Amino acid sequence: MENCIEVKNITRHYPQFSLTNVSFNVPCGSVVGFIGENGAGKSTTIKAILGLLKDGEGSITVLGEDSRKLSPETKEKIGVVFDGLSFPENLTVKQLDKVMGGIYKTWDHEKFFGYIKKFELPLDKRFKTFSRGMVMRLSIAAALSHATELLVLDEPTSGLDPVMRSEILDIFLEFMQDESHSILISTHITSDLEHIADYICFIHKGSIVFTEERNEMLEKHRILKCTDDQLAAIDKSDIIGMRKGRFQNEVLTVNAAKYPDIPADAPTIEEIMVYYVKEQ
């Protein structure tokens, strides 16, 4: 199997939002970072991938199966972290362990409680008393505690302090030591992706802007630091987005080589996203 997720031309229409011909792949053995501003369509796309949105055009396969008709065996291989609490709020960690053990044949009690201890989560407090950071740590622990081959993560590090975020990213990297494992991670904390992502998929206003290998994307984009006169000399077709200042202008481009006399800096993933959105 070449791709563990294949999204082909999915279209979904809602009163104030649409996904339009969304297509991208998650190659097996890779981490794909799914980026876009709030409301761009990340969470809706993830719900479609998980078979939670039945209507609409296009097709999605997950681990070789139609996402709307996943077999119990395939569901065992998918770990999911939603952006928020996805378990009944009156449960405790101990109760959740029993519930999940009844759902997943491959549920690993020892591994689950190992993560719970690592994440310093209480065993007997109800989830409704948990902070957002605690909820995300709980969800990650559960997602990793069965025979998971594919992680689908919606804002998994949101609400976590920098130290815990770093620990979580290390856990994801450890998960990826197995070459059969794959991750699709949606996040607005794009700096996280600079540590773990192999590919970046950028969605804006319900449409895919690009899907590219991370290092290649970072290498080809440059931010030109230019005067007004230099800006006037730049071909408009070379300008992806720009920011005008009192003393200096910044232009995102993939054609910096055409302007050797203009200083150029390497952008971050966040800067690339911001400039694309500013232009559009």
Where are these regions (language model features)?
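Conserved beta-strand
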Residues: 7-10, 17-27, 34, 58
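Walker A (P-loop) phosphate-binding loop of ABC-type ATPase nucleotide-binding domains
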Residues: 37-41
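Helix-to-loop junction immediately C-terminal to a conserved catalytic motif
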Residues: 50
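Conserved ABC transporter NBD signature motif
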Residues: 58-69, 73-74
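ABC-family P-loop ATPase nucleotide-binding domains
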Residues: 76, 80-139
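Catalytic Walker B motif of ABC-type/P-loop ATPase nucleotide-binding domains
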Residues: 151-155, 160
